[in-house]
Each structure stands twice: as C-alpha cells, then as structure tokens.
C-alpha cells in the first residue's frame, strides 16, 4: 500500500499535479493504514490483558493449592497431637495401675506381717507376762505404723481417684478431639471437593478463554489477511482501471485524430474526384474538337487533291481562295497540334490524379482498418471494465459474507453471555447457600464473582471489537464506493460507444449504492442488537 502511495505520488510529481481520483485514493489508503495499525495495536493490547488475566488466575490457583497444602499439614499435626495424647494417657494409666498393684502388694504384706505379729504377740503374751509392757509399746508402734500405712493408703486411694478423674477427663478430651478432628476432616473434604470443583471449572474456563483467545487471534489474523488481500486487490483494480482509462483516453484521442484525418482525406478524395471529372470533361471536349478538326483536315486534304488535279490555269479569285484555304488549313493544324499537346497534358494530369486517388483510397482503407481495430480494442476495454465491475461485485459479496460471519460470531457471543449469566446466577445461589461456612470460602467466592464479572467485561470488550470490525468493513465498503465514483469521475466519454458505457457504469453505480445502503442498514441492525444484549447483560449484573 505504501508502495502504491509512493507510485501515485511519483506519478503526481512527474505529471505536475494529482488528479482528484488519485488524491482521494491516497487519502483512502492512508485511512486504511491508520485503521489497520490502530486495530492491530488494540488487539495486541487486549491479547496482553487476557494473558495477564490468565497469569493472575494461575497464581490464584497456586495460592489456593498452597493454602490447601497448609490445611493438610495442620490436619496431620492435629492427628499427631491426638495420637501423642492417647499414648501419654495410656502410659499414665499403666503407671497408675502398676503403682496401685504395688500398693496392694505392700498392703497385703503388711496385713500378713500384722497377723503374724498378732499371733506371735498372743503366743508371747500367753507364755511371757514379763515383757507385757515392751510388747504393748511394740504393738502401739506397730499400730501407729499400721495407721500410717492406712493413711498412706487413703492418700493413695485419693490420688488414684484423682488420677482416674484425670484419665476420664483425658478420655473425654480425646473423644472431643477425635470428634473435632472428624468435623475438621469433613470440612476439609468438603472444602477440598469445592476447591477441586472450582479448580476444574477454573481450568475449563481458562481452557475456554485460551481457545477463545486463539480463535480471536486466528480471526484477527484472518481478518488482517483478508483486509490486506482486499486492499491489494482494490489497489490492483484501481491501478489497472487508471491504466485502462489512460489507454482509453489516448486511444480515443488517436481515434478522434484518425477520424479527422479520414474526413480530410475523404474531402480531398471528393475534390480529386471533382477535378478528375472536370479534366475528363475537358478531355472529352478536346476529343470532340479533335474529331471535328480531323474532319476539317480530311475535307481540306480532299480539296487540295482536287485542286492539284485541276489545271494550273486559275483565276486570281481562285488563287486568293486557295491561299485563304491554305491559311485556314494552317490554323486548323495549329489548333490540332495544340489540342494534341493539351490532350497529352490532361492525360498526364489525369494519370497523376488517378495515382493520388489510389494513394488516398489506400490511406482511407488503412485508416478505416485502424479505426475498426481501435473500435474492437475499445470493445475489449469495455469488456475488461465489465470484468472489473464483476470483480468489484465479488468483493462486495465477500464483504457481505464477512458481515454474515461477524453476525454469526455475534450470535455465538450472545449465547456465551447468556451461559455466563446462568453461571453467575448459579454461583450466586451457591454463595447464598454456603455463606455461613467460613469467611475464607466467602472471600474465595467473592473473588470468583469478581473474576466472572471481569470475564463479562472481557466479553463486552470482544463485542466492542466486533463493532469496530463492522465499522472497519463499512469503511472498506465506502472506500469501494468512492473508488467506483472516482472511476466514473475520471472517465471522459467522447463517442457514442463511450456514452453507452458511461450510462452502463452509472447504472452499475446506482445498483452498488443500493447494495451498500442495504449493507449499512444490516450493520446498524446488528449494532442495535449487540447494544441491546450488552444492556440486558449489565441489567442482569
């Protein structure tokens, strides 16, 4: 396109000025370049924004996974603490049981030793009354010792009861911790399921957005290639049309010059024919006069022969008559010679005029042949012009097909928006049902809602991009219409065939205007529908 603009500028500088068609074409090419560059930068910015959004989503998923790992670690630590408490309680119960067993054994030993002492004392009391006081003091000592052991036994029993209460409290605490662990495990399993479902939905949405981004990039590339192809095709058509118009103008000028030359040659031919006819008339008159003179010469010859036969005796009157006849004969011979010379001159002039007439006739035939060839070439140029018209019509049909594809893409976007609104509604219901679970889950769901709204905004931006593509196609249609108008303004009909071609081109222009008006109406209807859909979506939000 830039090469075409440079070629047009060079041609304009070489010619000293740019025509209106070339200036308008240059302006249109600049506008197309600006539009393509603007759309390319806009699409690159939106692609970068979508990529950053996907990166943020992946980072959030990583943070959720790290939080889930932390909660798993906390649950493992709680399990370890519960197991340690159970081990400690079991060890304490075993120690308490061993101590009680030892106390029971010591108590049994003391009871047996007390019984033995009682028996021994009874035997000694019966056998020996002397040591009664010593035995009594010994008995009191043993009784005090027994009381001490009984007190210790009571203390140990109290301590055993305290230990048993501690064991029961530890058992209740263990049960409470086990129940709490089960509740936490259930909550973690529920949260894990929710996180897995959210992760799956997020992955599916990421895949969907990635595929949509790829499709959008493919559509952008295809649209850019199509725009470049159409632009190149329009440039080629404009260049060929301009060259054809220039050739047509040159050939029409040559045709006019040939017609003028042919008319001049025909006029010269008519003049030569008139001169030839006059010369032929003169020759005919000279021939008639020659015949008359020849008859007179014959008459004088016969008269001279008669006079030679007559006798020589003549009268003076006859001699005078004879001399007069001789003078008449000389004058007749002179006229006859003059007539011969004039006849020869006229014959040479006639020969020259016939040669010039033949050359003029050959020139006329050659010019007529060239004129027929130029008419045929003009017809071929008209056929090429019709082909260019058909090509422009095909380009319009392609633009219409592009609009239809954009409308189908718009319908797909509408379906996607309705699906997203349903998902948002379902997520609102889910958020309302699971609102009292925990603040962390509520924050995550709010983040999901924000992400869904961001996706809705992205869809709205995609709709805006489709609208801008429609405007760009409309600009392309206007450019094609302006190019056709420029072609019609640049055409200079100079012959009846050129006027017929001009009328045909004007009819084709009116038909193309009608098609473009219908196309603009269709684009406006699509625009209203897209705006209505966006308003409905914003109202649902």
Curated annotation (Swiss-Prot):
| Keyword tags | Acetylation, Cell cycle, Cell division, Coiled coil, Cytoplasm, Cytoskeleton, DNA damage, Mitosis, Phosphoprotein, Ubl conjugation
Task: Please name the Gene3D superfamilies in this protein's record.
Answer: 1.20.5.340
| Post-translational modification note | Polyubiquitinated via 'Lys-48'-linked ubiquitin, leading to its degradation. Deubiquitinated by USP36, promoting its stabilization.
Q: Coiled coil where?
A: 22-199, 242-305, 346-485, 514-541
GO cellular component terms, A-Z: centriolar satellite; centriole; centrosome; cytoplasm; spindle pole
Q: Where on the tree of life does the source sit, at the highest rank?
A: Eukaryota
N-acetylmethionine is found on 1
Location in the cell: Cytoplasm, Cytoskeleton, Microtubule organizing center, Centrosome; Cytoplasm, Cytoskeleton, Microtubule organizing center, Centrosome, Centriole; Cytoplasm, Cytoskeleton, Microtubule organizing center, Centrosome, Centriolar satellite
Could you tell me which InterPro entries the record lists for this protein?
Answer: Cep63/Deup1_N
Q: Which residues carry this modification: Phosphoserine?
A: 278
Q: Does the keyword Phosphoprotein apply?
A: yes
Q: What does it do?
A: Required for normal spindle assembly. Plays a key role in mother-centriole-dependent centriole duplication; the function seems also to involve CEP152, CDK5RAP2 and WDR62 through a stepwise assembled complex at the centrosome that recruits CDK2 required for centriole duplication. Reported to be required for centrosomal recruitment of CEP152; however, this function has been questioned. Also recruits CDK1 to centrosomes. Plays a role in DNA damage response.
Assembly? Interacts with CEP152 and CDK1; these interactions recruit both ligands to centrosomes. Interacts with CDK2, CDK5RAP2, WDR62, CEP90, KIAA0753/moonraker and CCDC14. CEP63, CDK5RAP2, CEP152, WDR62 are proposed to form a stepwise assembled complex at the centrosome forming a ring near parental centrioles. Interacts with CCDC57; the interaction is required for their location to proximal end of centrioles. Interacts with FXR1; promoting its stabilization.
Query: Which family is this protein grouped under?
Result: Belongs to the CEP63 family.
Protein name (record): Centrosomal protein of 63 kDa
Give the organism the record lists: Pongo abelii (Sumatran orangutan)
The record lists the lineage as:
Eukaryota, Metazoa, Chordata, Craniata, Vertebrata
